[in-house]
């Protein structure tokens, strides 16, 4: 697994930091579901980052709890290094970020593979108390199937939030295959299904005979 980080060198004034800004004190719990597996997050208080490493075989989600010392505008940088253990190469990776307090997303990007871009849709009005934003990462060099070359997607983003000293964050990720791959996979599934039905019909005819 590639052990790279997105290093965001931004002045305190640019991030809107002030003497009254909160500090994140810990990321005490995490969970994962679906086709996503994550090792224990590594939180670094000095630079307010959390590093996430894991692997993904299909649509899945990761949840974090975040604690701060005051409720005033902390910023957390989230770095991900995810191995592709699915059955197809990724050329797009759509991340949904949801929190239980209002927040903004900034500085989204990909370290590796090269050539990827990121577009951000900021959270709108809450639904059932949950605010949700979207980051669409678009390739670039495809993320190949692990353990081939370029089989880890190393990406990151920042979230700035406020309103509490205890937060929940859910990162839901949907990897997208190369154009035409869905057709190939669907055709393969249809062919397999057709072969199975034909085989069952043949067995029934043999029994009748």
Model segments located where?
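Mature extracellular "passenger" or substrate-interacting domains of secreted, surface-exposed proteins
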Residues: 23-175
């Amino acid at each position: 697994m590639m052990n790279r980080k997105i290093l965001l060198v931004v002045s305190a004034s640019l991030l809107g930091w002030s003497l009254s800004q909160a500090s994140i004190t810990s990321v005490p719990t995490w969970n994962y579901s679906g086709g996503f597996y994550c090792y224990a997050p590594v939180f670094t208080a000095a630079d307010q980052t959390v590093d996430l490493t894991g692997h993904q075989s299909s649509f899945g989600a990761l949840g974090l709890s975040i604690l701060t010392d005051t409720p005033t505008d902390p910023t957390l940088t989230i770095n991900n290094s995810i191995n592709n253990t699915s059955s197809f190469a990724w050329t797009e990776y759509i991340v949904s970020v949801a929190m239980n307090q209002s927040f903004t997303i900034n500085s989204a990007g990909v370290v590796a593979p090269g050539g990827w871009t990121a577009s951000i849709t900021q959270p709108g009005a809450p639904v059932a108390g949950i605010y949700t934003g979207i980051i669409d990462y678009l390739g670039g060099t495809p993320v190949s199937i692990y353990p081939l070359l370029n089989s880890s997607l190393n990406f990151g983003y920042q979230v700035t939030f406020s309103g509490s000293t205890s937060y929940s964050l859910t990162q839901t990720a949907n990897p997208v295959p190369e154009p035409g791959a869905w057709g190939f996979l669907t055709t393969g599934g249809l062919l397999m299904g057709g072969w199975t039905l034909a085989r069952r019909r043949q067995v029934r005819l043999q029994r009748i005979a």
